[in-house]
Curated annotation (Swiss-Prot):
Membrane topology classification: Multi-pass membrane protein
Presence of the UniProt keyword Cell inner membrane in the record: yes
Tagged with keyword Membrane: yes
NCBIfam families noted in UniProt: PRK01821.1 (NF002494)
Family: Belongs to the UPF0299 family.
GO cellular component, one term: plasma membrane
Keywords: Cell inner membrane, Cell membrane, Membrane, Transmembrane, Transmembrane helix
Official protein name in the record: UPF0299 membrane protein YohJ
Cytoplasmic side, ranges: 28-30, 84-92
Amino acid sequence: MSKTLNIIWQYLRAFVLIYACLYAGIFIASLLPVTIPGSIIGMLILFVLLALQILPAKWVNPGCYVLIRYMALLFVPIGVGVMQYFDLLRAQFGPVVVSCAVSTLVVFLVVSWSSQLVHGERKVVGQKGSEE
């Protein structure tokens, strides 16, 4: 019985912490003069708490594991909801494809540039000039 209660407590604590960060983000988003989704702010709050080790990762692991495991199932209602606007998507297909392609290229360039900035040029073992 004690083990069962411990498992229930771990899942409950994980989901409460995740939802607390979500609702804190929604509250902060309502106060901001710019439009930033509260879920994004909540995710950043959770990231900061985990990165600064204010919140131990083992406290949110059970809830994160469940959410990631069933992520594909959680996207089904979103996909069905998008199909309500199929006519609008068909009319705007060109701009949607162009914006997806451009944003993918921009993300690719920013990630490659920042990776190069952070990691710099590394010498490969066996490469000429790598002997010290």
